[in-house]
Amino acid sequence: MENTDQNIEITAETSAAAENTESTSLVPIDEYLAAGVHIGTQQKTQNMMKFVYRVRTDGLYVLDIQSTDERIRSIAHFLSMYDPSRILVVSARQYGQYPATMFSKSVGAVSKVGRFIPGSLTNPVQEGFFEPDVVIVTDPAGDAQVIREAVNVGIPVVALCDTNNMTSNVDLVIPTNNKGRKALSLVYWLLAREIANERDIPFNYEASEFETGL
C-alpha cells in the first residue's frame, strides 16, 4: 500500500512524541505532520526499522519525525560542502519530479527527472553523460538504476527513504514518506533552504513553490 497525501493521520501519540523537539526543529512539528512526512507504508525493511516510531492499528508504519528533522539538517551540512553544480538530484517518481527540479534550481544543482537513461553516469559517450560528486535520489526503488551506476563509479548516494526501502547501497538516509506530494515538496524545500543557509546564500522560496500542481 502506497502512502499518499490522503489518509494522513495526525495522532496524539505522534504529536506528544514530537513536543520536545518543537523548539529546535527546522519547521514546526505540525507542518511535518500536516504534510504527512511521517506516514510510512504497511511494509518495513530491517534497514529502516531504526527510523520507525510506531505501527498503527491498520498496520501502517509511522516514521520518527525527530530523525527526519535531524537527518535533513546534517545532510544539508554535508551537501553544502560540495560545489552545487556537481550535485545530481533524480526522481523517477512523479510527485518527486517537480520538487527535485525546484531543489536544483534553487541551489544550482543538476536534475534528471523522469526515466533515467542507463549509462548516464558510467558511459562517457552517452548523450547526457554527467559526472556528479554526489547523487540525491527520491526513492531507492524507483531510482535503482541511478544508485547502481553511482555505486559502480564510487559516487556517494543520499536517498529519501520510506519504511519499505532497502538502504544497502545508500550512504545517507533521509527517512520520509517519499510517495506523497506534500511530503516530498516539504523535504526538498527544507533541504534546499538549509543548504542555502549553510552556504550563506539567498533563499527566497516558499515551501508551496516546491509542490507540484499535479
Curated annotation (Swiss-Prot):
Keywords: Ribonucleoprotein, Ribosomal protein
One term of GO molecular function: structural constituent of ribosome
Database matches in Pfam families: Ribosomal_S2
CDD domains: RPS2
GO biological process annotation, one example: translation
SUPFAM superfamilies per the UniProt record, alphabetical: Ribosomal protein S2
S-S bridge residues: none
Family matches, as InterPro entries: Ribosomal_uS2, Ribosomal_uS2_arc, Ribosomal_uS2_CS, Ribosomal_uS2_euk/arc, Ribosomal_uS2_flav_dom_sf
CC per GO annotation: small ribosomal subunit
Annotated HAMAP family: Ribosomal_uS2_A
Family named by the database record: Belongs to the universal ribosomal protein uS2 family.
Protein name per Swiss-Prot or TrEMBL: Small ribosomal subunit protein uS2
Naturally occurring in which organism (per UniProt): Methanococcoides burtonii (strain DSM 6242 / NBRC 107633 / OCM 468 / ACE-M)
Upper classification of the organism: Archaea, Methanobacteriati, Methanobacteriota, Stenosarchaea group, Methanomicrobia
